[in-house]
Amino acid sequence: MTEKALFITDTFENLNFKKDTSILMIEEAFKKEINVFQCEINDLFVDNNDVLVNCREINSLSEDIDTEVTKIDIDLKDFKYCFMRKDPPVDEDYNNALHLLDLAKHNGAVIHNNPCALKKFNEKVFATHFPEFIPKTLISSSINKISAFFDSHKKIIIKPLDGMGGTSIYKVDDLNEDNLKIIRTMTNSEKTQIICQSFIEDVYEGDFRILIINGCLLY
């Protein structure tokens, strides 16, 4: 029997076909002759303790992919692999999906990444466990603390804790009224923590994404 893989993603209209790693993974699955299915998080459901998904099969990739393909219900245990590739924000819908995936994992489905790990670890907060490898960092909702952090570093980056893909990231090199207004908005009037980091000038030289699997570099 041909192996099946499920990719839980954003809508195809919102995927960047030039850089989204989910697209690269799907292409690799095609090369390995794995039957590929796709869904969004709202397609997951529970029926008598079984976690199923209303998903579509994908036979090829293109930016104008036909999303009107008839969907079918499949138990997550019937997939060789289930990849949770939905991007933030980590909102109520996202967390509800993780709860369902955790139940599916308990029932024997193979889920990547582990739903418990996704629930437990915010990737931006998790990075603070390794301070020697990241810029000077402040996580706070206090405008006074953020202002003091700016005074110490003169140039800082501010961004939400649940963002991704470069959205809502601001470089602050002057604590003028416009930037204070941005900070007030991002912190929801000092009710929501944001992450602030000292600005690294070398960012203009580009960066590298390093993937490590079982302690080995993935080339």
Annotate each PLM feature.
Residues F7, F83-M84, Q197:
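Redox-cofactor binding/interface segments in oxidoreductases and associated redox assembly factors
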Residues E3, E13-I139:
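Conserved N-proximal alpha/beta basic substrate-recognition cap immediately N-terminal to
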Residues N144, D151-K154, G165-Y219:
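Phosphate-binding site of ATP-dependent enzymes
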Residues M1, I74-D78, F150-S152, N188:
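Flexible, charged surface loops at secondary-structure boundaries
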Residues E132-K154:
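Rossmann-like NAD(P)H-binding beta-loop-alpha module
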Residues T9-T11:
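Extended, domain-scale alpha-helical bundle/helix-rich regions
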